[in-house]
Each structure stands twice: as C-alpha cells, then as structure tokens.
Swiss-Prot record:
Species annotation: Caulobacter sp. (strain K31)
Name this polypeptide is given: Elongation factor Ts
Taxonomic lineage of the native organism: Bacteria, Pseudomonadati, Pseudomonadota, Alphaproteobacteria, Caulobacterales
Subcellular location, record wording: Cytoplasm
Gene Ontology MF term list: translation elongation factor activity
PANTHER family: ELONGATION FACTOR TS, ELONGATION FACTOR TS, MITOCHONDRIAL
Record-level GO cellular component terms: cytoplasm
Region annotation (Involved in Mg(2+) ion dislocation from EF-Tu) ranges: 84-87
Protein keywords: Cytoplasm, Elongation factor, Protein biosynthesis
Pfam families given in the database record: EF_TS
Domain of life: Bacteria
Function: Associates with the EF-Tu.GDP complex and induces the exchange of GDP to GTP. It remains bound to the aminoacyl-tRNA.EF-Tu.GTP complex up to the GTP hydrolysis stage on the ribosome.
CDD domains: UBA_EF-Ts
Similarity field: Belongs to the EF-Ts family.
Length: 312
C-alpha cells in the first residue's frame, strides 16, 4: 500500500477543495492515487471541483478569421500561446496571430498551418521563430479549427476582445441551410455567444465521449445507492441524473442562455421555420486560452452574455 504523505494530502486538497481528513481518507481508500481519490470524493459528494490535474498554464491570443465563399463561408480559429499576458497587447504579436489565422482558412490542423505560408509569403513556423527572436518570449501555435459550409454561414464571437477578432475566448459556429445569410449569421452569432458562456462538450448526445457518460453514470449510481432506495428506484434516479448531465453539456440540448425557456435545438428549428428552410448546426468550436487553468475569479460568462444582449 502506498504511503499517504502530507504532500499527497495537500495536493489532493488543492485539487478538490475538500478538507484534510476527507482527503487523507480518500487517499487511503485509493492507495495514494490522486485521480482515483478525486473520483472517490465526487462519488461521496464531497469534491467541490472537477479534476484539475495535468493542466498547463498559457497566455497569448485566440484569433479568428471568416471569409465569404459564394452562398457559404469558411472560417478559422487558432490559439497561439506565449509566456506572458503582456504580449497579447503587443502589435507585432497581434499581427502574427491574424496572419496565422488567415493561413488556417486554407489549411487544416496545426501541422499543416505551421508549414503553410502567410498572405505575405512567410512560412508560419518561420514567422514564429523570427518573432521569438525579436520579442524574446517563447510562442507556439497550440490549437486550430476550421469550418466550411457551401450554403449557410459560419458565425464567430470573441469574448472580451483584446483587439478586433482577437481575445481570450474564440468561438465558431457553422450553420448549414438556404435562406437569408445575414439572418443565419445573426442566429449563429447568438449561438456562438451561448457557447462562450456555457462551454458545451459536444454538439449532440451521439458526439459525446461515451466513456465520459459511463464515468458520470458510475458516480451517480454510487451516490444513489447510498440513499438506500430499491434498485428500481436507484436506476430511475441515475437515468434522471444522466438526462440532466446531457442537458448541461450537449449544445443542442442546453437551455439557450438568452431565453432559458427553449433549447438551442428548438431555437434553430424555430429560425428555420421563419426562413422557410431547415437549418442544421454542423459544428462548433470554443477555444479558450490556457483552457482548464484556474487563474482566479473570472466572472459569470452567462450573466455577461445576457447583459451584453439586453437579456439581464
């Protein structure tokens, strides 16, 4: 059995927000395994925070660019990391992120974008190398996303923009369908703001990682069994919790932040009826700078979005 040291207890306490004695008990029960102990605490209803292990701090910018293509659109989003927040306000860095985002319009994936040329002919990887030498900070293209629709729109949204199309959170939402592109774009922007606020994990239940669902099911089952209720009742309790979980993390099933009385799926269907043509959300991406890292209070995104749209 692994020794439960004071350092292990301290680490688990910092990651879970649970008291020292409960952390020690969790570690004893799970042979000193931090991740297993966090799951154990969650199952007991003690953990105040989700797993926070293996998360890397990052600064820099998320950049977005959108290009009209006939009746459709192409859009790209990139996350370029740097060492300090100060660099996000540097014009050279901002210009570089915009160039990298534009390279993402015709190239998909970090590797392809890194090997591609910017609009002025410089290879993206060389651009970053030169910028590192000039500014003296390490920089890296961490993530990218690209959407294209032949008919419809790809809407974008930057939360708390540092400069036009640059900020700490960038969202793209691709909607396919015929009709007034301006209205489709308006719908897409509302959904993009919703995505920034709620951070859904998937577009539909089928897209959600089944391992994540089973993990939640196991935790919910352990919690329900502690109630002492009959197995049939426990099963219903668990299924109810799973439905609620999906409503919280699946975009189309979420309550729309600007009108909680309807889901995003219902919002899209209603908009399609108004346009006289069905609309389909083909995909979305939410790039948050240094995603998953706690850096202190950041405010309530849902409340901010509602306030910005006059829904508060």
């Amino acid at each position: 059995m692994a020794e439960v040291t004071a350092a292990l207890v301290k680490e688990l306490r910092e990651k879970s927000g649970v008291g020292m004695m409960d952390c020690k008990k969790a570690l004893v029960e799970n042979n000193g395994d931090i991740d297993a102990s966090i799951d154990w605490l969650r199952a007991k209803g003690l953990s105040k925070a989700a797993k926070k292990a293996d998360r890397v701090a990052a600064e820099g910018l998320v950049g977005i660019v959108v290009r009209a293509e006939g009746a459709g659109m192409i859009a790209a989003a990139v996350e370029v990391n740097a060492e300090t927040d100060f660099l996000s306000r540097n014009e050279l860095f901002q210009t570089a992120v915009r160039k990298i985002a534009r390279a993402g319009l015709d190239n998909e994936g970090v590797e392809a974008i890194s090997a591609a040329k910017t609009p002025d002919g410089e290879v993206v990887s060389d651009l970053l190398t030169h910028l590192i030498a000039t500014i003296g900070e390490n920089m890296v293209l961490r993530r990218s996303a690209r959407f294209a629709v032949a008919h419809g729109a790809v809407a974008s949204y930057i939360h708390n923009a540092t400069a036009p199309d640059l900020g700490r959170i960038g969202v793209l939402v691709a909607i396919e369908g015929a009709g007034d592109q301006t209205k489709i774009l308006e719908l897409g922007r509302k959904i993009a703001m919703h995505v920034a606020a709620t951070a859904p994990l998937s577009l539909s239940p089928d897209d959600l990682d089944q391992a994540a669902i089973e993990k939640e099911r196991q935790i919910f089952t352990e919690q329900a069994l502690e109630s002492g209720k009959p197995p049939a009742v426990v099963e219903k309790m668990v299924e109810g919790r799973i439905r609620k979980f999906l409503e919280e993390v699946v975009l189309l099933k979420q309550a729309f932040v600007m009108n909680p009385d309807q889901t995003v799926e219902q919002l899209v269907a209603e908009a399609g009826k108004e346009l006289g043509s069905p609309l389909t959300v083909k995909g979305f991406v939410r790039l948050a700078l240094g995603e998953g890292v706690e850096k202190g209070p950041e405010g309530d995104f849902a409340a901010e979005v509602a306030a910005m749209t006059g829904q508060a």
